[in-house]
Each structure stands twice: as C-alpha cells, then as structure tokens.
UniProtKB/Swiss-Prot annotation:
Gene3D superfamilies: Single helix bin (1.20.5.510). GO terms for cellular component: chloroplast thylakoid membrane; photosystem I. It is a single-pass membrane protein. The keyword Transcription does not apply. May help in the organization of the PsaE and PsaF subunits. This is Photosystem I reaction center subunit IX. Pfam families: PSI_PsaJ (PF01701). It is found in: Plastid, Chloroplast thylakoid membrane. It comes from the Eukaryota. The keyword Nucleus does not apply. Signal peptide: none annotated. GO terms for biological process: photosynthesis. Keywords: Chloroplast, Membrane, Photosynthesis, Photosystem I, Plastid, Thylakoid, Transmembrane, Transmembrane helix.
C-alpha cells in the first residue's frame, strides 16, 4: 500500500516536470523558427 501512495505522489510531479519542459522546448523552437508551417516545404 505504501508503494501505491509513493507512486501516486511521484507520478503527478514527474508528469508536471515533463510537460513543463516539453512546453518550454516547443516555445523555444517556435521562438527560434517562428513559422513551423514552412518546415515541410524545405
């Protein structure tokens, strides 16, 4: 039962960090390369 409580307390933290870093990465990519619609035409 303790393992389940540990998992339930760790999983939201890891997913928040993961999605936060993913959002930051996408924001930086869009800042460096503003028009992502032009990528398929290169």
């Amino acid at each position: 039962m303790q393992d389940i409580k540990t998992y339930l307390s760790v999983a939201p933290v890891l997913t928040t960090l993961w999605f936060g870093s993913l959002a930051g990465l996408l924001i930086e990519i869009n800042r460096l390369f503003p028009d992502a619609l032009s990528f398929p035409f290169f």
